[in-house]
UniProtKB/Swiss-Prot annotation:
It catalyses: deamido-NAD(+) + NH4(+) + ATP = AMP + diphosphate + NAD(+) + H(+). SUPFAM superfamilies: Adenine nucleotide alpha hydrolases-like. It is an enzyme of class 6 (ligase). This is NH(3)-dependent NAD(+) synthetase. The keyword Ligase applies. One of its GO terms (cellular component) is cytoplasm.
Length: 275
């Protein structure tokens, strides 16, 4: 066991391993209640979430839809609604899976905002991009795509008295695998503390198709590396990340990659610094 496993797990509020179907269901209910309490406390009426077709957004969407349906069924008001948002950049290569996710969630509403024009317009107007290599430019615009998607979600939320849901969980948080003020910007994170396999278990328990539950995770932000798996970007598998966070034995090399990346990305998990 690496000397920092417990420290990092505590900092990220890692959820205890599930012990069976009952514990999965208990966690589902707890997180639905959390979403409902966020709506009540904020005074907002809707939940807004971008649906990519991956297991994380599918799971968060299923929890959100159940949360608002529960509030309506309890007589708290028909105004509580979940708005799913499709956010393709021009043509989405996994369009079928994104649509499958929407069909699975059955959101109250589904909007589509193609961010291509906005991203390319900003790129054309930004002189700082001109001296960059193709690889550097691709990386920068990848982060711009993530930020533009969050702009779109907050625009809808602002118009509809809504809260924006984030899909961050412990296995991504430890690696800083999100864009600062992009997909890392949100009002609530109902998957927080879960490791990747727990997200999959919850998705399966909520009825997500096997195709989405076990889809290879990819941020798919860089055009020069389309469909690049998260694990290729991490340099370590989600199995190793999950085991590390749950205090299980992990190969020394994998553990060191996780710790080094956690330290390097600390700024992403902190509020802006003050004097």
């Amino acid at each position: 066991m690496h000397s920092r496993q417990q420290e990092i797990a505590v900092a990220l509020h890692v959820c205890a391993p599930f012990t069976g179907p009952e514990s999965v269901q208990t966690e589902i209910e707890r997180r639905i209640r959390f979403i409902q309490s966020c709506l009540r406390e904020s005074g907002m009426k809707t939940l807004v979430l971008g649906i990519s077709g991956g297991v994380d957004s599918t799971t968060a969407g299923l929890l959100a839809q159940r949360a608002v349906e529960g509030m309506r069924a309890a007589g708290e008001g028909d105004h509580y609604r979940f708005i799913a948002v499709r956010l393709p950049y021009q043509v989405q290569h996994d369009e079928h899976e994104a649509q499958l996710a929407v069909d699975t969630i059955k959101p109250d509403e589904c909007h589509t905002v193609n961010i291509g024009t906005a991203v390319l317009g900003l790129a054309a107007a930004t002189e700082a991009l001109e001296p960059l290599s193709p690889e550097q430019r691709d990386f920068v615009l990848g982060n711009t795509k993530a930020r533009m998607r969050m702009v779109a979600q907050y625009t809808i939320a602002n118009a509809r008295q809504g809260l924006v849901i984030g899909t961050d969980h412990a296995a991504e948080a430890v690696m800083g695998f999100f864009t600062k003020f992009g997909d890392g910007a949100c009002d609530l994170t109902p998957l927080a503390g879960l490791v990747k396999d727990q997200v999959r278990q919850i998705a399966a328990a909520l009825g997500a198709p096997e195709q989405l539950v076990h889809k290879v995770p990819t941020a798919d932000l860089e055009e020069l590396s389309p469909g690049k798996p998260d694990e290729a970007a991490h340099g370590v598998s989600y199995r190793n990340i999950d085991d590390f966070l749950q205090g299980k034995p992990v190969p020394d090399e994998a553990a060191q990659i996780i710790v080094d990346t956690y330290d390097k990305t600390a700024h992403k998990r902190q509020l802006p610094k003050e004097p």
